């Protein structure tokens, strides 16, 4: 939770779009996503839908491909990932995925201020988690993340590391927990998820 709280203080700028999709066509496809992720990609904790505004287009596209192929969202304990799979499967082909990713990349990244809640974190992939902990102490744990995600959490396409600054803390906490226990990153084709698992496992417990 300390490292999650520290990530919540980061202010890395969004990476430049790299997919030349048709954002206007993607806008139509995105209508399916609005109910959970919001009209501007702001997310909805009550629906366990993360903020997607501010994520790089190439990362959005990769996750949609992974959901569609069952690389992500197929683990029996990945409740919310399983909910995403049929949504991704409504996108007919690579072009449709690129289009919606390009549209999402037009959203304002906004900011996600550090939470002041101090409710005990829930287990992986069950309910939305609230986080507590010291951002300053989390800075030490974040040192291992810097080489890929950057000092300010801006991400690095060359290293296939997404932007994490501005993301909601409850979602970051859940994903770290999911990576740690193998709910995420255990599929044989999830190359980058497999790279994240040992990083998450460095965190000794929910308070780390």
Where do the PLM segments sit?
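Axial heme c-ligation environment in periplasmic c-type cytochrome domains
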Residues: 1-4, 15-21, 45-51, 68-107, ...
């Amino acid at each position: 939770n300390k490292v999650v709280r520290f990530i919540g203080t980061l202010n890395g700028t969004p990476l430049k779009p790299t997919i030349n999709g048709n954002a206007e066509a993607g806008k139509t496809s995105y209508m399916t996503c609005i109910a959970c992720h919001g009209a501007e990609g702001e997310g909805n904790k009550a629906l366990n839908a993360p903020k997607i505004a501010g994520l790089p287009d190439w990362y959005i596209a990769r996750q949609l491909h992974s959901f569609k192929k069952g690389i992500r969202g197929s683990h029996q304990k990945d409740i919310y990932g399983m909910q995403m799979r049929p949504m991704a499967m409504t996108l007919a082909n690579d072009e449709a995925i690129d289009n919606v990713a390009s549209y999402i990349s037009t959203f304002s990244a906004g900011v996600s201020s550090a939470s002041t809640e101090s409710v005990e974190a829930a287990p992986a992939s069950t309910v939305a988690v609230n986080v507590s902990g010291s951002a300053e102490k989390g800075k030490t744990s974040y040192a291992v993340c810097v080489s890929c995600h950057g000092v300010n959490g801006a991400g690095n396409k060359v290293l296939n590391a997404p932007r994490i600054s501005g993301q909601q803390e409850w979602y970051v906490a859940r994903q770290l927990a999911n990576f740690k226990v193998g709910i995420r990153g255990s599929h044989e084709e999830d190359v980058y998820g497999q790279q994240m698992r040992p990083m998450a496992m460095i965190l000794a417990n929910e308070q780390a």
